[in-house]
């Protein structure tokens, strides 16, 4: 799948870590933006700050990993965000490690299997275990944020507008997500893929909005990111706390 994945295979899976002072396992800079768009945004936004912010949260999702072995990353001290009925909870991570055949891979990938309806595995969260507060919006792996789409919702009495913009059709340029006019995501190029909203609610216990987003830059790429309000730079709503990237190309 082109030169991007040849590079990824050399660097194993990419786990971008969060805003605490622990040392990260590995870091990957957010892909550079080569073209400016016409979206009116603040001069300082979380996209620019994420390039220099040290990151030390770690996340994984249920997936058949090719580029790393999740068994060497996750352990029983991790927690998970999971869905039970219409409610969402944070609890002790329950998972399994399996070897599953992949017809598109020359090696046997390692599958991280969930025991519940897991959205995200995280090495740490400041929130207490139990039911978490969520925004009044339906979200799942099919809640796509296609260019031109707008999601309006409220959380903790505050109204939010999550808007997606991009240029082009199949090959999108400057794919951008705006939260109340503040740019939180921008990718210079996205090939035949769409972003998606996986979760919106409070994951760090400060009563403010946090997000889990699917942000693939290619239709054969896994890329999920955690955004926390407690990682927000001054005067911004949130910052990227962690990201996981892997590949399922043929």
Regions found by a protein language model. Name each.
Residues 5-14:
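Sec-dependent N-terminal signal peptides
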Residues 16-18:
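C-terminal motif of bacterial Sec signal peptides marking the signal peptidase cleavage site
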Residues 20-22:
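Bacterial signal peptide processing site
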Residues 26, 30-180:
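Terminal, intrinsically disordered low-complexity segments enriched in charged/polar
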Residues 145, 187-197, 245-250:
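Repeat-based blade/solenoid architectures
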Residues 149-151, 195-203:
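Beta-propeller blade termini
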Residues 162, 205-215:
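Acidic/hydrophobic-patterned starts of short beta strands in beta-sheet-rich repeat architectures
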Residues 221-241:
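Beta-propeller blade repeat segments, especially FG-GAP/WD-type strand-to-loop junctions
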